[in-house]
Amino acid sequence: MLVVLGLLTSFLSFLYVIAPSIRKFFAGGVCRTDVQLFGKVVVITGANTGIGKETARELARRGARVYIACRDVLKGESAASEIQADTKNSQVLVRKLDLSDTKSIRAFAEGFLAEEKQLHILINNAGVMLCPYSKTADGFETHLAVNHLGHFLLTHLLLGRLKESAPARVVNLSSVAHHLGKIRFHDLQGDKYYNLGFAYCHSKLANVLFTRELAKRLKGTGVTTYAVHPGIVRSKLVRHSFLLCLLWRLFSPFLKTTWEGAQTSLHCALAEGLEPLSGKYFSDCKKTWVSPRARNNKTAERLWNVSCELLGIRWE
C-alpha cells in the first residue's frame, strides 16, 4: 500500500512539474484577428463571469458597446466596472436577463430594442450544467430551458435588429459533450427518465442543431451563425457537482483559463472570411467535426418546430 501511495505521489508530482508544458499543449487556438469594433453593438449572455466575462473584456477592448445580459445584476455590475477600468471603455452596460424565465427574456429584448437601433454580434454564452432535476416557471426542464430554449427565444426576438445591422453574427456556446447527447422527443423534459449529466449533453446537442438550422434559414440575410466548443475550462459551470469541483481543482493546472476558453467565441465573432462556414461547429478557433446526430437535418428541423411550439412563437 505504501509503495502504491509512493508511486501515486511521485506521478502527481511529475505531472505538476511538467504542467507548464502540458498547459501550453492544451491551451488551444488564439483569435488572431485585429478587427476593431468602434460603433458596433454586442450582447453577451452570462458575461458576468467565466468565459463570457473574458469575451466581453476583449470586445470592449476593441471598442464595442457591450451589453452584459445576466441574471445576477450585482455581479454583472461588478464585472462591468472591472472591464471598464481595464479597457478604458465606459460603454459596458448591464441588463437583467434570466434565461430560465421567458417573461424575463421578453422584457430584456423589449428594453434592448427600445434602447438600441443596431446589434452586430449576439453571443449566447450563458449556461448551466449538472443541475438536479427541476422545472422552470414555464414548465421546462432546467438544462433545456436555459441552454437551449432561452437562447432560441432571445435570438428570435433580436433577429430583426441583427438583420437590420448586417453583416452580423450569432455565436452559440455548445460543448464537446454534444457527442453524448440525443434529442429524446418522446421525453424532452425528462419526465420519464432524468440523468443530470445526459441532460446537459442533450442541451449541448440542441445548441449545435439550432445553429445548423438557423444558418439554413438565414441564408442571404447577411447574418451568420456558429457553434463553439470553448474547451475544458476552469470555470464555475461545474459548481453543482462536488466530484467535478474536486476534479477541476485537482487538474486545474491542465485546464484552459477563461481567457483561453474565450478565444474560439472571439474567433467566430470577429474573424474575417467565416461567412461560408455559417452553421458549422468550431473548437480551438477552427472548424471541427460534430457527432452524426448533430448532422441530422431532419432532427434539426424537428427540434426547431418543437421549440417554436413550446415557446408559442412563429419564426418566419
UniProtKB/Swiss-Prot annotation:
Pathway: Cofactor metabolism; retinol metabolism
Tissue: Expressed in the retina.
Keyword flag Oxidoreductase: yes
Keyword Cytoplasm (UniProt): no
Catalytic activity: all-trans-retinol + NADP(+) = all-trans-retinal + NADPH + H(+); 11-cis-retinol + NADP(+) = 11-cis-retinal + NADPH + H(+); 9-cis-retinol + NADP(+) = 9-cis-retinal + NADPH + H(+); a 4-hydroxynonen-1-ol + NADP(+) = a 4-hydroxynonenal + NADPH + H(+)
Gene3D superfamilies, A to Z: NAD(P)-binding Rossmann-like Domain
Broadest EC class assigned to this enzyme: oxidoreductase
Residues noted as binding NADP(+) in the record, renumbered to the chain: G46, A47, N48, T49, G50, I51, G52
GO terms for MF: 11-cis-retinol dehydrogenase activity; all-trans-retinol dehydrogenase (NAD+) activity; all-trans-retinol dehydrogenase (NADP+) activity
Residue positions binding substrate: S175
One Pfam family here: adh_short
Active site positions, chain numbering: Y200 (proton acceptor)
Taxonomy, superkingdom: Eukaryota
Record-level GO BP terms: cellular detoxification of aldehyde; retinol metabolic process; visual perception
Cellular component annotations (GO), alphabetically ordered: photoreceptor inner segment
The entry's keywords: Lipid metabolism, NADP, Oxidoreductase, Sensory transduction, Vision
Signal peptide extent: none
Family note: Belongs to the short-chain dehydrogenases/reductases (SDR) family.
Further details from the record: Shows clear specificity for the pro-S hydrogen on C4 of NADPH and the pro-R hydrogen on C15 of retinols.
Protein name as it appears in the record: Retinol dehydrogenase 12
Organism: Bos taurus
Gene (UniProt): RDH12
